[in-house]
């Protein structure tokens, strides 16, 4: 087995799928660690081509020889909820001012999408996490069982 490479840095970014470019915030974050920015942009854009329109978080592990690996995450729950409710942004006062609504089935659908990143044992628990995120954004959850 080849010897393990030594990790020199860890970067977390949220970039539009298929639209990574060397401009901020990508360029400065990667440049500080000595990563080949264009190489990352091409690899990221190729990997996220099928998810265009979503923000896809990425965790980049940078090694001492300036090589890197990256792991794609699922889009943030807040962005998926805004898309499901057809909103631009959440409420500034979520407890008093409701800006939209989603159904329990939509919460389950989002939980299904995010299941690998959620800290939940089953789909219902995942949907409850998503419903909590919705409530904190001022989005009403209709037909909730919790």
From Swiss-Prot:
Pfam family, one: Ribosomal_L11_N
NCBIfam families: L11_bact
GO biological process: translation
Keywords linked to the UniProt accession: Methylation, Ribonucleoprotein, Ribosomal protein, RNA-binding, rRNA-binding
Source species, domain of life: Bacteria
Regions crossing the membrane: none
Xref: SMART domains: RL11 (SM00649)
Regions annotated as coiled coil: none
GO MF, one annotated term: structural constituent of ribosome
UniProt-listed HAMAP family: Ribosomal_uL11
Designated name of the protein: Large ribosomal subunit protein uL11
UniProt modification remark: One or more lysine residues are methylated.
GO cellular component, one term: cytosolic large ribosomal subunit
Signal peptide: none
Similarity field: Belongs to the universal ribosomal protein uL11 family.
Function: Forms part of the ribosomal stalk which helps the ribosome interact with GTP-bound translation factors.
